[in-house]
Amino acid sequence: INLLHVSVLNPLLSDSDSLRLIGEYYFRRGYYAEALELFERLSAAYHSDSEIYQKIGFCYQKKGDYANALEAFLKAEIISPDNFWTIRRIATCYRNMKKPEMALSYYHRAEKIQPENLSVQMNIGHCYVEQKDYEEALKYYFKVDYLDPEGGKAWRPIAWCSFLVGKKEQAQRYYEKILDDKPVSLDYFNAGHVEFSLGHIRKAIDYYRRSIELDNGDSAKFLSNFKQDAPDLISSGIAASDMPILLDQLMYGITDSL
C-alpha cells in the first residue's frame, strides 16, 4: 500500500520529513515504484540534495528505465562530481543504452578514484570489447587476473579476446584452465574454435561434442552459433571450405552414437 494514496493519511504525511521517512522505508524494502514517487516529490523542494537524485536514478534503473535513471544520476553528479557510486551508475546506464564510448569515459573516472576495483577494470575491458578494441580490452582483463589470480573472473574474456587477436596459444592456455574448473557449454564451444584454428581437428570435434552434450544435445543451436562465429573462424585462418567437412564429421559422430 502506498500510504500517500490513502486519502485520510495524505494530509498528515505530506511534509518533507514524513515523505523522506516513508520514501526511505519503501526504498530499503525494495518497493522502488512507491519510493520513486516520493523521492521525485522531494526533489522539487531539495534541488541540491545529491542523495535524492541518486535514489531516483536507482529506482529508475531497477525498472529498466536507463534514460531516466541516467538523467537523475547526472543531476546527482552536478551536485557531487567525484562520487564514485554515482560515476559507476552513470557508466552502467551508458553501457545498457549501447553507448560504450560514454560508458568508458565514466569508468575511467571511476578507475582514477579506485584504481584496483576489479569490477571497474572488468567493465572497462567490456567497453573496449564492445568497440572491438580487443588488444586494449586484454590489458584490463590481465590487470584483473593479476590482482585476483585465483578468482578466474577474467579467464573467459582473456581467452576469447586472445583468440580474436590471433594469440591462439595464449587462448588455448586459458581455455585449458577454464575447462579444468567449472566449464559450461559455451566454454567447450569456444575452446573448440581455438583447437580448430590450431589445426587440432580431433580435439576440436571432441570439444564441440561436449558443448552439444552440455546444452541438452541441441545440435541445431550449436550449428546456428557456429554459423554466427564463422567470420571469426575465417579471420583466425580457418579455410571456409574446411568448416562443412568438420561439421559433417562432428554430426556423423553424434548421429552414430545415438
Predicted stretch roles:
Residues 28, 62, 96, 130, ...:
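Register position in tetratricopeptide repeats
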Residues 215-258:
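Terminal, low-structured helical/coil segments at or just beyond the last alpha-helical repeat
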Residues 43-44, 74-78, 108-112, 142-146, ...:
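Conserved structural position within tetratricopeptide repeats
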Residues 1-18:
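TPR-adjacent "capping" and linker segments in tetratricopeptide-repeat scaffold/adaptor proteins
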Residues 17, 51, 85, 119, ...:
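Start-of-helix register in tetratricopeptide repeats
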